[in-house]
C-alpha cells in the first residue's frame, strides 16, 4: 500500500556532490562508469543492459531503499511483503523469499552476495546502484537468470584533503524521522577511515489493530566503518564493516466482509436448535449449555460494507513482530602488476531474523494462530580474479569464486485452537499465556520433554538446516577484431554441494499423546534426498560493432541455470510432489547504445528473448492431501507452496534516455515491457477446496504469465535549477512513474490496478554547496496500490 508523503529534508554538506550530468557551459552528459564486467568501464561500451543510478541521483530524488528504485528505473519491481521478506521482479521473473531454491535475481552489497532481506535494508552513503538486467551466467558471483542488483557504498578516500562529510535530517508524516551522517577521517597520506550511520523511524502505512490497539511501527539503525589503505600506487586495500538492525511491529490489514450468513449466525442458530430438542427431551440435559462455550467471533466494530485494504485495519489477536540483525565483513585487495591487475575479495556475513505472525488474519480465533520463524544465516565468500592490461587486442578476466552458505531455520506454531475454540473460557493456548512466542514454547518442550504432558496444547516445532557450498571457475575474453568491432565470450564451470533436512518435533501434551506421535521427531526429508551434488556450465557470447565512436550495436547470448531441489512443505504431502528438476535458460539480447547531439542526448534500447526449459515455479495455497502415520488424511491448504517445472518463454523491451535541455534543465526516463507465458501443456497447482484426489489439485496454465509482473512500466524525471536572487540557487525536480495493471498470481479473478506515482522536490542550496534544504512530496496524487496479496 502506498500513501501520500509530505516530507521536509535539511541537508548539511561540506563537499560538492557528484552529478550524473554536466553542469557547465559544455552541456554534455557525463560518462557513467560501472564495474558490471568486474572492471571499470563506460556503461555505453557494455554489450548488455545496465541501468546505473548514481549516489547523487539517489539523494536528489529522495530514494532511500530498493522499493523506491522503480521510480527512476523501469522494468524492475521491489516489494516488501513484510520486514522479513521481500520480492524483486525483473524481466518477468520473480525472486521468492520463501522459495528455498536458486533465485532468478541476486542482490549484492560491495560485491558480497546477500539474502534479499539484507539487500532491502535502507540505503545510505551510497556511491551508486547498478541494475544488471538479463542472465548473469559468467562474471557475477552467483548465477542468476533474470539479473542482479549491485549496491556500492562509498569508500574512504586516500590522499585527498577534500572534506566530504555531511549530516542529513528528515522529518515526514506518519511519524517518519531520519538522521544520516558520514565523514572521512584522514589518518595519514596512505590511510583513511570513513564512518557512516543512519537512524530511521516511522509508522509505515499506519496500520492499526483494532483488537489489540497496537499500531504499526518501524525502527532501523545501521553503522558502517570503511578503511582504505594505499601504501603505493600499485596496492589498494579496503575493509568495510557494516552492522544493522531492524525492529518492526506490523499489523496485517485485511479486506472483505463477514459474508452471509456470518459464522456467528450459523453457530447461534445451531445452539438454539439443540436447546429446542433438549426441551422436547430428544437431547441430553445441558447440551445447549455445553455448546455455549463455543467461540463465535463478532465483528461489531467493522462497517456494514466490510473493510477495504486502504482502511488499514487489522483484526488478529497476536501482534506480528519482525527483528532482523545483520553484520557484513568485507575485505577488498587490488594489486596493479603492470601487465595484469589482481583482485582478491573475502567476505563474511551473518544474519539473524525473527518473524512472529498471526496466521489467523481475519481474527476468527479467540486467541489467534501464532507462528514464529527464526533464521540464522552465515555466508562466507572468496573471489580471486586476474585481468590483463597490456593489450588493446585481447582483453580477458580469469577467476575463481567460492561461496559457503549455512542456514538454520525454525518454524514453530501453536495450533491449540482445536480445543480453545470450543471452550475458550476453560482452555488457553501456550502462546500468549505460559509463553510469549511459539519458539519459547518449543524450546521449553525440547529442554523438558515431559513438562507439557498435562497441558491441552498442540504445538508443532520444525527445524530446517540448509547448507550449500559453491565453487566456480570463470573466464571472460574480449577480442577486438578492429577498432569498431569486437567479439566477447565467457564460460563458468561450477559445482554446488548441498545438504537439506526438515525435522518436525511434536511436544508431548494431553492432546498430542505418545500414541498419536507426541514426543517424536519426524524427518520430513528422506536420508537419501538430504545430500545433493550438482555441476553446471553457463556462458555468454557477444558481438559488438560501433557505427561511430558514439553508437554501439550489439547481440548478446547468455545461458542460465537453477539447481534442482526439494520442496520444504510445512505439512506431510505425497512424496511425488516434493522434487523439482534443474532449470536451464537461453537469453538473447539485441541492443543499441548511442550518444547524440554532441553529447547532450543519450538513448539506449534493447530487445530480449528467453527460452526456458523446466522453469521453476512455486505455487502457494495449494489444496493437497495430507499424509499421516495411518495413511492419507484430509485435503488441506499448503501454505508454503509446491514447485513445478514447465517450459516458458519471456520477451520484452528496455529503453532509457537522458537529455540536457540547457544549462539549467536535464530530463530523462525509461520504458520497459515484458511478455511471459508458460508453454502449451503446462500444469500448475491450484487452490481447489473441492479436490478429492491423493496428491494435489492442478490447473492448466498454458499461455498464462509466469509471474504477476506488470507488462509495461515507465518513468520520467526532470531537474530544473535557477539562481536565487537572495543567493545560491533554487531547484525543482519532478519524477513520475507508472506501472501497468496486472492479475494477481494468487487469484486470477483479482486485478491489481495500474499504479501512477508523481513526486515533486523543491529546494534551495548555497552557492558553495555547504548546505541544502528541500521540501518534497511523494505520491502527490495519493494513488494506492496493492503491492502484495496473501490468500
Across the structure, where does each feature detected by a protein language model lie?
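Acidic, small-polar-rich N-terminal luminal/periplasmic segments of exported/outer-membrane proteins
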Residues: 27-158, 590
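Solvent-exposed loop segments that connect transmembrane elements
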Residues: 207-214, 251-314, 358-371, 412-463, ...
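Membrane-embedded beta-barrel scaffold of Gram-negative outer-membrane proteins
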Residues: 332-337, 341-347, 352-357, 546-562, ...
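Gram-negative outer-membrane beta-barrel transporters
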Residues: 389, 395-396, 480-487, 606-611, ...
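C-terminal beta-signal and adjacent terminal beta-strands/loops
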Residues: 618, 667, 735-745, 764-791
Amino acid at each position: 500500500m502506498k500513501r501520500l508523503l509530505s516530507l521536509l529534508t535539511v541537508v548539511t554538506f561540506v563537499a560538492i556532490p557528484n552529478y550524473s550530468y554536466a553542469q557547465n557551459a559544455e552541456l554534455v552528459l557525463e560518462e557513467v562508469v560501472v564495474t558490471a564486467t568486474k572492471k571499470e568501464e563506460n556503461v555505453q561500451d557494455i554489450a548488455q543492459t545496465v541501468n546505473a543510478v548514481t549516489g547523487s541521483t539517489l539523494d536528489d530524488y529522495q530514494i532511500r531503499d530498493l522499493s523506491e528504485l522503480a521510480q527512476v528505473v523501469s522494468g524492475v519491481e521491489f516489494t516488501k511483503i513484510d520486514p522479513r521478506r521481500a520480492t524483486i521482479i525483473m524481466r518477468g521473473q520473480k525472486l521468492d523469499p520463501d522459495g528455498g531454491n536458486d533465485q532468478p535475481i541476486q542482490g549484492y552489497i560491495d560485491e558480497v552476495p546477500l539474502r534479499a532481506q539484507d539487500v532491502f535494508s535502507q540505503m545510505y552513503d551510497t556511491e551508486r546502484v547498478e541494475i544488471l538486467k538479463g542472465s548473469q551466467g559468467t562474471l557475477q558471483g552467483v548465477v542468476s537468470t533474470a539479473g542482479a542488483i549491485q549496491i556500492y557504498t562509498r569508500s574512504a578516500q586516500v590522499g585527498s584533503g577534500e572534506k566530504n562529510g555531511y549530516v542529513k535530517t528528515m522529518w515526514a508524516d506518519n511519524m517518519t524521522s531520519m538522521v544520516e551522517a558520514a565523514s572521512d577521517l584522514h589518518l595519514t597520506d596512505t590511510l583513511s577511515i570513513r564512518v557512516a550511520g543512519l537512524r530511521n523511524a516511522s509508522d509505515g502505512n499506519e496500520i492499526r489493530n483494532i483488537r489489540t490497539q497496537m499500531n504499526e511501527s518501524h525502527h532501523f539503525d545501521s553503522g558502517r566503518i570503511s578503511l582504505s589503505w594505499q601504501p603505493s600506487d600499485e596496492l589498494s586495500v579496503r575493509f568495510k564493516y557494516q552492522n544493522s538492525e531492524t525492529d518492526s511491529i506490523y499489523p496485517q490489514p485485511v479486506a472483505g466482509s463477514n459474508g452471509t450468513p456470518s459464522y456467528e449466525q450459523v453457530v447461534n442458530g445451531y445452539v438454539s436448535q439443540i436447546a429446542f430438542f433438549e426441551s422436547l427431551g430428544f437431547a441430553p440435559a445441558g447440551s445447549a449449555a455445553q455448546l455455549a462455550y463455543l467461540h463465535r467471533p463478532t465483528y461489531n466494530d467493522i462497517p456494514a460494507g466490510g473493510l477495504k485494504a486502504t482502511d488499514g485495519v487489522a483484526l488478529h489477536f497476536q501482534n506480528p513482530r519482525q527483528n532482523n540483525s545483520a553484520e557484513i565483513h568485507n575485505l577488498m585487495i587490488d594489486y596493479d602488476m603492470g601487465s595484469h591487475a589482481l583482485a582478491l575479495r573475502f567476505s563474511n556475513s551473518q544474519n539473524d531474523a525473527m518473524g512472529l505472525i498471526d496466521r489467523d488474519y481475519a481474527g476468527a480465533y479467540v486467541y489467534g494462530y501464532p507462528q514464529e520463524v527464526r533464521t540464522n544465516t552465515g555466508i562466507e565468500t572468496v573471489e580471486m580474479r586476474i585481468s590483463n592490461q597490456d593489450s588493446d587486442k585481447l582483453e580477458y578476466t580469469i577467476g575463481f569464486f567460492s561461496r559457503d552458505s549455512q542456514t538454520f531455520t525454525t518454524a514453530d506454531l501453536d495450533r491449540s485452537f482445536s480445543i480453545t475454540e470450543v471452550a475458550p473460557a476453560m482452555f488457553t493456548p501456550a502462546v500468549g499465556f505460559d509463553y510469549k512466542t511459539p519458539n519459547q514454547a518449543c524450546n521449553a518442550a525440547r529442554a523438558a520433554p515431559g513438562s507439557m504432558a498435562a497441558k491441552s496444547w498442540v504445538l508443532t516445532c520444525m527445524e530446517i538446516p540448509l547448507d550449500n557450498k559453491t565453487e566456480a571457475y570463470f573466464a571472460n575474453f574480449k577480442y577486438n577484431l578492429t577498432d569498431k568491432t569486437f567479439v566477447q565470450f565467457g564460460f563458468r564451470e561450477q559445482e554446488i554441494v548441498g545438504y537439506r533436512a526438515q525435522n518436525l518435533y511434536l511436544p508431548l501434551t494431553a492432546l498430542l499423546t505418545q500414541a498419536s506421535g507426541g514426543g517424536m521427531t519426524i524427518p520430513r526429508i528422506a536420508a537419501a534426498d538430504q545430500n545433493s551434488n550438482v555441476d553446471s556450465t553457463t556462458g555468454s557470447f557477444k558481438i559488438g560493432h560501433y557505427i561511430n565512436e558514439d553508437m554501439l550495436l550489439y547481440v548478446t547470448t547468455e545461458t542460465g541455470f537453477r539447481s534442482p531441489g526439494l520442496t520444504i512443505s510445512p505439512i506431510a504431502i505425497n512424496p511425488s510432489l516434493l522434487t523439482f528438476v534443474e532449470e536451464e535458460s537461453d537469453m538473447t539480447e539485441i541492443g543499441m547504445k548511442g550518444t547524440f547531439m554532441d553529447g547532450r542526448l543519450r538513448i539506449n534500447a534493447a530487445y530480449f528473448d528467453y527460452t526456458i526449459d523446466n522453469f521453476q515455479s512455486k505455487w502457494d495455497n495449494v489444496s493437497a492431501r495430507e499424509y499421516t502415520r495411518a495413511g492419507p488424511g484430509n485435503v488441506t491448504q499448503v501454505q508454503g507452496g509446491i514447485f513445478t517445472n514447465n517450459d516458458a518463454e519471456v520477451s520484452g523491451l528496455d529503453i532509457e534516455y537522458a537529455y540536457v535541455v540547457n544549462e539549467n534543465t536535464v530530463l530523462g526516463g525509461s520504458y520497459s515491457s515484458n511478455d511471459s507465458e508458460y508453454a502449451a501443456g503446462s500444469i500448475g497447482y491450484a487452490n481447489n477446496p473441492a479436490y478429492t484426489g491423493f496428491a494435489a489439485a492442478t490447473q492448466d496454465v498454458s499461455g498464462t504469465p509466469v509471474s504477476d509482473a506488470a507488462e509495461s512500466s515507465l518513468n520520467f524525471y526532470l531537474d530544473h535549477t535557477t539562481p536565487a536572487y537572495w543567493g545560491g540557487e533554487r531547484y525543482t525536480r519532478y519524477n513520475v512513474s507508472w506501472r501497468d495493471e496486472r492479475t494477481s498470481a494468487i487469484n486470477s479473478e483479482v486485478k491489481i490496478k495500474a499504479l501512477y506515482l508523481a513526486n515533486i522536490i523543491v529546494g534551495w542550496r548555497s552557492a558553495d554547496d555547504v548546505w541544502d534544504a528541500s521540501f518534497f512530496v511523494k505520491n502527490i496524487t495519493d494513488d494506492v496500490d496493492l503491492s502484495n496479496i496473501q490468500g
